[in-house]
From Swiss-Prot:
Interacts with HscA and stimulates its ATPase activity. The keyword Cell membrane does not apply. The keyword Chaperone applies. InterPro entries: DnaJ_domain, HscB, HscB_C_sf, HscB_oligo_C, J_dom_sf. Belongs to the HscB family. This is Co-chaperone protein HscB homolog. Pfam families: DnaJ, HSCB_C.
Length: 173
């Protein structure tokens, strides 16, 4: 499998829109082939190579499974590494981040589980809009700035989703 792209590992074309079921099925097929148990009696070198390939498949799968990671990966394939400093230069985005974090803090302070559920539904809608926007522009070099901006926003939503999950766990206890 060598240095093939994450997409090539799974026989997929590089695209933001992926058939997640096909990706999962292909992942399971490939991982079964290199599972360490299959190489238990093999020479040490083969065991190590199988373990390395399993780790590579897992990393590729995790990257392609996540919309924000997939977006960053697609941009990196085109030579675009996202800089964190650019996020700070987007005042509207910074304001939105602050407002969402304040709202989440208020939900935590009030222990409002129903409010957290509504907040999470809004985030899911926001994520779907970002995904559609990125899918429409990532491959167009003229819209690269927009694709990078959307990918950064996806990252922010990922972090916010993680905070929401933590809050849900605390409120459920």
């Amino acid at each position: 499998m060598g240095n093939a792209s994450h997409f090539a590992l799974f026989d997929l074309e590089p695209d933001f829109r992926l058939d997640q079921d096909r990706l999962a099925v292909r992942y399971r097929e490939l991982v079964r082939r290199v599972h360490p148990d299959r190489f238990a009696g093999a020479p040490e070198r083969e065991q190590r190579l199988a373990l390395e390939e399993a780790a590579r498949l897992n990393e590729a799968y995790q990257t392609l499974k996540s919309p924000s990671q997939r977006a960053r990966y697609l941009l990196s394939l085109q030579g675009e590494e996202l800089s964190q400093e650019t996020t700070v230069q987007d005042p509207a985005f910074l304001m939105q981040q602050m407002e969402l974090r304040e709202e989440l803090q208020e939900l935590q302070d009030s222990a409002d589980l129903a409010g957290v559920a509504r907040f999470k539904r809004r985030l899911v809608q926001d994520q779907e809009q970002l995904n559609e926007g990125f899918a429409a522009c990532w491959a167009d070099p003229r819209r690269r700035d927009e694709a990078e901006r959307l990918a950064r926003r996806m990252q922010f939503l990922d972090k916010l989703f993680a905070e929401v999950r933590q809050l849900e766990e605390r409120l459920d206890d």
